[in-house]
A protein has these predicted regions:
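Bacterial N-terminal signal peptides
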Residues: 7-15
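Compact, glycine/acidic-enriched structural inserts
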Residues: 238-303, 344-347
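Alpha/propeptide regions of enzymes that mature by internal proteolysis
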Residues: 33-36, 115, 340-362
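Conserved, charged catalytic cores of large soluble enzymes
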Residues: 149, 173, 323-342, 347
Length: 430
C-alpha cells in the first residue's frame, strides 16, 4: 500500500467555504469515522464505522479522483448542464426536466426510508467536505450538494432510459420549429456481455463471474467499500453514485448487460384545444392535458446568465416529447427514483441468489439492465430487468400505440416469475 489517508486528518481549509460552523463540526465528526487507503494502483479502499460513514468516504475518494466527472453527471441528471456549457445544452436540460424538478426530488427524499436518507445525507456531506478542503477545485456550477440530489441519478449504466428521447424532435416540438424528416440512422451492432460459470465446470470448484464493463477505461471509479455494519463490496461505481454498480462482495457477484428490451413505450395522443388549454382523448373523455412551467438557466458567452422558459405537457402516461404528423407523443418509462436507489444500494449487500432476488422483487426498479449473477454457494443466474410493464399483446409496442385506447395502458408490472430468466442451468454456464 503506497498511500494511507485518514479523512479525519485532512487539512481543513475552510477559509473559502460558505459552510456554517455546525456543518463543519458535523463533517469533521463524520470524517473521523472514515479511513481511505490507496493501494499501489491508486484504488481507494474505504472503511467506515457505519454504512453512511462508508458512503461519506466513498464519495470523497471519488471526488479526489475525478470531481469534474461527478459534477458533469449531476449537471446532466439535474437538468443544469446549460449553466456550465451554455445555450447549446438547453434541450438536454429540458429533457431531464420533463421528469424531475427540485421540489419533486425534495419530496422524494422526504418520503425515503430513514436509512436511505442517512446515506444521502452522508453522500452530500462527503462531497461538500471535499469542496471545503480543496479550495483549488472550482466547480463549474454545483458549488454545494444537497442530499436530495442523489435521487436524480440512481442508475449506473452508460445511458439512461431518458436518452431514448430524441433531442432534435424535442426541440422541434417545444420551439415550434419544424425539422426535416430523417431516416433512422443505422448503427453498427454492438455487444454487451458477461459470463457466469458454475462450480462443476471450474478447476477449483468455485463459481466464476466475468465482468465486462464495456465502457471506456475511466468511465467508472474502482473502489472497495466496507463498514462495521456488514458492507463489504468491491467493483465499479459510476462517478458520483454511492453504490457499486458492477462487482462483488464476500459472497456474491453481479454484472449488468444492456439489451434495451421492455425499456420504454410511446403513446400517440389525440389532442384538442379547450379554451386556453388542451385536452387529450382517453376512451370517450377528453382529459385535461397536464402542464408544467420549466425555466432553464444558461451561461452566456460573457459569463453572465440568461434564462429560457417553457411550458411542458404531459398525460397520465408521461411527458409529451414530440409530434408525429398530428398526434402528440407521450413517453413512458420507469420513474421510481427512491425505489431505484434502494435497490441499487441494497443489492450490494446480498449474500446469495435468494436475497438478491428478494431485493429485486421488492423494488422492481431496474428497467434497463439484465443481470448475470454468481455466488459462493455455486448458484449462477441470468435475470431480466425487473421493471417490465404488463402490456396488451394485441398491440405492437415497438411503435407508438394509440393513447386514446385505454387498453394500451400499462397494467401494473410483471412478477419476477413471469420474466425471462436462467437460474442454475444444467449446462453450468450463462
Amino acid at each position: 500500500m503506497r498511500k494511507t489517508f485518514a479523512a479525519a486528518l485532512a487539512p481543513l481549509l475552510f477559509v473559502l467555504t460558505a459552510a456554517s460552523p455546525p456543518e463543519l463540526a458535523r463533517w469533521r465528526a463524520e470524517a473521523s469515522q472514515v479511513t481511505i487507503t490507496r493501494d499501489d494502483w491508486g484504488i481507494a479502499h474505504v472503511h467506515g464505522r457505519t454504512d453512511p460513514d462508508a458512503v461519506f468516504g466513498m464519495i470523497y475518494a471519488q471526488a479526489e479522483d475525478d470531481f469534474p466527472r461527478i459534477e458533469a453527471n449531476y449537471l446532466t441528471n439535474l437538468g443544469r448542464t446549460a449553466e456550465a456549457d451554455g445555450e447549446k445544452a438547453i434541450w438536454q436540460d429540458l429533457r431531464a426536466r420533463l421528469y424531475i424538478s427540485d421540489n419533486e426530488l425534495k419530496a422524494d427524499y422526504a418520503r425515503s426510508p430513514l436509512a436511505m436518507r442517512r446515506l444521502m445525507d452522508a453522500w452530500a456531506d462527503g462531497l461538500n467536505y471535499f469542496l471545503a478542503t480543496h479550495p483549488n477545485v472550482h466547480p463549474r456550477a454545483l458549488t454545494r450538494f444537497e442530499p436530495w440530489m442523489a435521487l436524480s441519478f440512481t442508475e449506473g449504466s452508460i445511458g439512461g432510459d431518458i436518452e431514448r428521447i430524441d433531442l432534435d424532435q424535442l426541440k422541434a416540438f417545444y420551439s415550434s420549429k419544424p425539422i426535416a424528416a430523417a431516416l433512422t440512422p443505422w448503427h453498427e451492432l454492438q455487444g454487451s456481455n458477461g459470463i457466469a460459470i458454475a462450480p462443476k465446470l471450474t478447476a477449483n470448484g468455485s463459481s466464476l463471474l466475468l465482468i465486462n464493463p464495456h465502457t471506456s477505461h475511466f468511465f467508472r471509479s474502482e473502489q472497495q467499500v466496507t463498514s462495521d455494519q456488514g458492507l463489504n463490496v468491491y467493483g465499479a461505481a459510476t462517478w458520483g453514485q454511492f453504490f457499486i454498480y458492477q462487482g462483488f462482495n464476500a459472497h456474491a457477484g453481479w454484472m449488468h448487460t444492456s439489451s434495451g428490451i421492455d425499456v420504454v413505450d410511446e403513446f400517440a395522443e389525440k389532442v384538442e384545444r379547450r379554451g386556453t388549454g388542451h385536452c387529450y382523448l382517453y376512451g370517450r373523455v377528453c382529459r385535461p392535458m397536464g402542464f408544467r412551467p420549466v425555466t432553464i438557466r444558461y451561461r452566456k458567452g460573457d459569463g453572465t446568465f440568461g434564462t429560457r422558459s417553457f411550458t411542458t405537457y404531459r398525460t397520465h402516461l408521461g411527458p409529451i416529447v414530440r409530434s408525429a404528423n398530428g398526434p402528440w407523443i407521450a413517453f413512458a418509462m420507469m420513474d421510481k427514483p427512491v425505489e431505484a436507489l434502494q435497490q441499487s444500494f441494497l443489492r450490494t449487500k446480498a449474500r446469495d441468489l435468494a436475497s438478491f432476488l428478494a431485493i429485486a422483487g421488492r423494488f422492481k426498479a431496474n428497467s434497463s439492465n439484465n443481470t448475470l449473477f454468481a455466488d459462493d454457494q455455486g448458484e449462477i443466474a441470468y435475470l431480466h430487468p425487473q421493471f417490465v410493464p404488463q402490456r396488451d399483446d394485441r398491440f405492437n409496442y415497438a411503435q407508438p400505440v394509440d393513447g386514446s385506447d385505454p387498453a394500451t395502458d400499462w397494467h401494473g408490472l410483471h412478477a419476477l416469475s413471469e420474466l425471462p430468466s436462467v437460474v442454475k442451468p444444467a449446462s453450468g454456464w450463462v
